[in-house]
Amino acid sequence: MGKRLLDKLWERHVVATNENGLDLLYIDLHLVHEVTSPQAFEGLRLTNRTVRRPDLTFATMDHNIPTKDVWNITDRIAKQQLDTLRENCKQFQVPLADIGDEEQGIVHVIGPELGLTQPGKTIVCGDSHTATHGAFGALAFGIGTSEVEHVLATQTLWQRKPKAMGIELKGKLPQGVYAKDIILHLLSKYGVAVGTGYVMEFYGEAIHAMDMEERMTLCNMAIEGGAKAGIIAPDEKTFAYVKGRKYAPKDYESIKKKWSELYTDLDVVYDLHILVDVTDLAPYVTWGTNPSMGVRIDEKLPEKHDANDERAFSYMGLSPGQSTYDIPVQHVFIGSCTNSRLSDLEIAASVVKGKKVKEGVRALVVPGSQRVREAAMHKGLHRIFEEAGFEWREPGCSMCLGMNPDQVPEGEHCASTSNRNFEGRQGKGARTHLVSPAMAAAAALYGHFVDIRKESYDGAISYS
């Protein structure tokens, strides 16, 4: 009997197994940011420990930083966390991409673009959306602060092996429909707990057709379905993406042969299998307060089924049976570790080129990293956005979460390319609607949601 991709990744990293069935995994890459690391580093000091492998650790500033006036940090706690990370990285000799550094950006954007993220690695970070890196055939998952300390001190982590879920995506995506819509469709159909206890492996015709940035979007939101991680077997697109990047292996050809072994064998059975035909999918919009509360753009909002629906409708200021086209949009956020890469910005720019943001709408574009920002500016995307009425910002987590200056006022609606729409996620009382970059860009032009499939733009990604 063959092995699943999860089995191969797991077995290659088991150092020991204890009497409770937990495996001690070796960690190949530990990504660090300013929010979940201060207590972990302090724990090292209190126990007189060092960072076991600073060469396998990489830190950046992303969650708390302003994206407009980046050096003017007025929040006392945010400034303290940023200063503390600088001090910790200096003391423990951990590489740091600080504000203004050419390598700085959202942790799950810079990992792949710098070549730190590679097939076959185990990757952890004190952040829920570490699953993003699974798009490269890596086993990547978020950890808590006590686990951050454990990895810093030992470069290992005790874990119980999850079950394997296979999600087969067959067919070809229609124009105007993207990876973001696939994951929102899956969540709306199967809920936020379907992946509990599992690692989701995405595969199939639609996966083969996607570029790496769309694959990252899928894996990024596997956690929203309750999964430990999301993974995709590496292929030639993966290898080509990694090749030549700053931290990519120097012995690329020999390493590539090992990477080519990372796939699920044909004769295996998943613990759970889901089949989705993407051919007839439509753009999705979330209406409620978790990512599974979403509908196709051409559907009406659902009826109330329980107290959760009742609360969500009340919080969002919406009604059952309401048209998605009637949902007002006062804010648009194009960014986050889900959709802030160059291809995301290119799609959004193609939608708004030569047009104007609706009066009364505040629209932000926040590139995921300094390198994404520079590449976008080289293509002139910043001029397209600014001429349309968007704000062009510096890299950071920004409006994805309400812990920096970029927030949505209470009671107002935001079309957001981020990954979570919980109550207060973008600020106290903020009403978040998760959509693709194309849908967010179009909403900025109209002040409400529209069906991007009916708009004239040339931003479709080729899936040939």
Swiss-Prot record:
Record's keyword terms, sorted: 4Fe-4S, Amino-acid biosynthesis, Branched-chain amino acid biosynthesis, Iron, Iron-sulfur, Leucine biosynthesis, Lyase, Metal-binding
Cross-referenced PROSITE patterns: ACONITASE_1, ACONITASE_2
EC number(s) recorded for this UniProt protein: 4.2.1.33
One Pfam short name: Aconitase
GO molecular function, one term: metal ion binding
Enzyme class: lyase
SUPFAM superfamilies, sorted: Aconitase iron-sulfur domain
Protein's UniProt keywords contain DNA-binding: no
Superkingdom of the organism of origin: Bacteria
Catalytic activity: (2R,3S)-3-isopropylmalate = (2S)-2-isopropylmalate
InterPro entries reported in the protein's UniProt record: 3-IsopropMal_deHydase_lsu, Acnase/IPM_dHydase_lsu_aba_1/3, Acoase/IPM_deHydtase_lsu_aba, Aconitase_4Fe-4S_BS, Aconitase_4Fe-4S_dom, IPM_dehydratase_rel_enz, IPMI_cat
Biological processes per GO annotation: L-leucine biosynthetic process
Named cofactor requirement(s): [4Fe-4S] cluster
HAMAP family: LeuC_type1 (MF_01026)
Oligomer status and interactors: Heterodimer of LeuC and LeuD.
Family the entry assigns: Belongs to the aconitase/IPM isomerase family. LeuC type 1 subfamily.
Summary of the function given for this chain in its UniProt record: Catalyzes the isomerization between 2-isopropylmalate and 3-isopropylmalate, via the formation of 2-isopropylmaleate.
Protein name per Swiss-Prot or TrEMBL: 3-isopropylmalate dehydratase large subunit
Organism expressing this protein natively: Bacillus cereus (strain B4264)
